[in-house]
């Protein structure tokens, strides 16, 4: 696990409380493996230990920053109703891949097949954009339906040509297919995990209410911000490196020009 390089976070336990991140499921609907993340039982509900959650978020921030630093991509997965819109929005903001509709089997383990579906979508788009020359209205209508269906399922992974360096899931119980594929390939999985989930397949657990929109949004916003900040850091560093290299090249160039001048000057004196 990544070391805690960030001592401060843009969120606090108070923020998590206000977002309802501490509310687990009813005590009758729980996974005993989540016991270590539970603070207490209250009115038939399990209450999640937010002190642990905050530390998990701190670790998660360091992890996503490390993934970005290694120039690897991140795949966000959340197909439940509460997560869809915010997951798509934040993934696009931070420039990472996402799946917020149906998980297509083989999205990770059979990526070549998914790439074929993307190519099919591109062919359809090209044909429709040229006016569907030579096609009947019915054929154009069928193509348009195929286009809409493919776009819906593939829009967030169209440019994903190799497996990501990290998969982040909202509710691993619902996204068990994505988790299983990531585990099979040895891709680390980070998950927003509620008290009814099995945390074992999740390498980086964030124990929280994975049903409340505010809870999901708060945590994903924090991760997205960390990704954006790290990418900006890399850009600034790369820019400084480029400026340093240019300055060094200019210094060397000036040095060589001076040497050439002195040699030419000496040669002119010798001719006299």
Curated annotation (Swiss-Prot):
Residue runs in coiled coils: none
Could you tell me which residues belong to the region Disordered? 238-272
Tell me the InterPro entries matching this sequence. Answer: Ribosomal_uS2 (IPR001865), Ribosomal_uS2_bac/mit/plastid (IPR005706), Ribosomal_uS2_CS (IPR018130), Ribosomal_uS2_flav_dom_sf (IPR023591)
Compositionally biased residues, Basic and acidic residues: 255-272
Q: Which Pfam families match?
A: Ribosomal_S2
Q: So which domain of life are we looking at?
A: Bacteria
- Any idea which UniProt keywords this protein has? Ribonucleoprotein, Ribosomal protein
Chaperone among the record's keywords?
no
For this entry, list what GO says about its biological process: translation
In alphabetical order, the GO MF annotations are:
structural constituent of ribosome
GO CC annotation: cytosolic small ribosomal subunit
Similarity annotation: Belongs to the universal ribosomal protein uS2 family.
The record ties this protein, via NCBIfam families, to: rpsB_bact
Give the protein's recorded name.
Small ribosomal subunit protein uS2
Organism source for this protein?
Protochlamydia amoebophila (strain UWE25)
